[in-house]
């Protein structure tokens, strides 16, 4: 069939081009999807959440210094339960003999043996990702397979891979639920594959372009696909239903063009609230907000693109199947709920007001936490179970690193001594307090005589060694004044001796050489962990939890102690400092997101409804759902990870507000045709399928994430999102209608109109049957009409009019005869929504 030239408005021309050039778009999508499949492998995922801390925080700066200057070897806490102390000693010996294990700390103190359980602190020869460490850990697991063993370690743990595996299972389960929901809410069974293919293309395009962001967080990488589906599936459903409506009176091509031209502005407007809510995340000081905002907004934009450019072609291809598989409406009417809302319009709002006030106070007292180490998820990994078991038996193991400028062993020694004297400190470790031999510490300064006695060297050899060291350090004055009182730190002298032996400048006897080689190996590892050219690292083990008021206060005490010996360029790094930095920025980020997300949504609603009052009413309901949602942790006395609040807050305000918009839009339109009480009942019936579809998908997706992932951050987001969506649905269905009814006066008095030019150029159209008319019409109409009319009528008027309507000439018959009133009622029941003439 020859394609017709596009007619009408610019939007119709765009729609015509997309529909007629669908094969071109299919080809472009094929290339884009193949590219995206390949490009998904280019995406870099960041698993360390501290990477997104602001650059000016102590933790971020300290981590940068620490990672650039030191090596951190892998460690493991291995607990073996139900063993005697003698058995534990044998196990310790076996662990020490494993290749790849540097050391095993174990003794008869309660720190390592308690309640018939032994705790071994294992240090590996490599980092957490090195093969030697991973292989050694596997050997430990095999060796202890016959014991009741719990191993808490980060060695060999691939957080990203584990999370992706969990999310794949969640996505499959979510897809099953989605197909069931779409089947229930669809008008034809063949619509479901169209919707799934459209979304699948959008999701793949988004994943395939994530590499453009450089590196994305593990949070964005794991939850974006499911959130994209839950947030954007409405767009495809709107176009699908538009096409179904238009196809009642038009052929496939014309119906698709008409549906797309009307759906583009409608869907674009609907997406603005979601995008604005997500956009608020980008203003967070914590970089994870910008990361999630970028990836999720990109996901929404790709969803829009797929709906506008791919889905019309799919509708054309599946048109016959859609017609052949139509089924009756499977979603029941909820007239009973509408009648309940009408009957309780003076009861529910006051109760809701009280609930909002109470939950606002409770939400403000929500017990937020900033470390997820001790959070317990519904599903726990083997490592999490081990961590809890060891914690319950031997207590916390809270380690922080103190980084100071290198070169002043006396200050390091005194600082470590001051820290050891604090009751909050379990133990400390640094070059200045590590035992060497014969009671000496590594940082102790020795004379040539003391060195000769310690190392078993002739005094002349020791003196020559000291002379060489003085020359190497350009301390020629020591050679002139005599070397007898010249003191050199033991660690520095050993490292100098190693360099000289390596260069062949010094040769020692075989036995001494072998002894020193073993010593040098240990010293090299100590230096890699504790000293660089610029900094020294002191390790401090605290008797405090990672997150508590006492811990935060003691960090201030540590800063004060450090300041006694160092004026600048010092850092404290650890999970506790991370908690302190995150908590200090949370208040500002929280206020910023709450205000911006609400402000963006209000501005959009203001111009959508052309009323200042209605947006406020909608915001009150959704903000109420947010407060109720986050009052639950307070009531349950459960800690909530702060990111769960920040992210879900913006999603609820940006996405759940759509449920309120749908009901309000239908109500605003319907109350022009019927009384407000009847309009709100009809609005609920019309809006329920949309809310049921979107709400069920988002709630189920959130619930699945919350109960099926072991990652505490992701679980917190999922739990809060699922619970918040359910609360939002309940409020918009059982509270918002009452507020709209009693708030009509406010809405009407705060309404305004935006004058826009009217294009009077029209083509003649002919149609018959049941139809909805929207726009300027000039010509002859024969039938029963129910509409707002402003203009000139040349003929006979026989109709019921609302109060305030002016008609000339006077005394027309304002009321329909009973038979025509019945005909009008039948027309209202059977008209085809969306038909325009």
Task: Give names to the regions the model predicted.
Residues 1-47, 101, 128-371, 546, ...:
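Membrane-embedded transmembrane helical bundles of large multi-pass transporters/channels
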Residues 2-4, 8-30, 37-41, 56, ...:
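Structural signature of multi-pass, alpha-helical inner-membrane proteins
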Residues 43-57, 367-380, 498-513:
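Acidic/glycine-enriched edge-of-secondary-structure segments
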Residues 52-54, 58, 69-75, 83, ...:
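Juxtamembrane segments of multi-pass membrane proteins
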Residues 56-61, 68-69, 81-123, 158-161, ...:
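Extracytoplasmic
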Residues 65, 387-391, 414-418, 522-528, ...:
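Generic recognition of flexible, low-complexity loop/linker segments
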Residues 74-82, 92, 107-164, 398-406, ...:
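A short beta-strand structural signal in non-transmembrane regions
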Residues 393-397, 423, 519-520, 528-534, ...:
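A structural signal for short secondary-structure junctions
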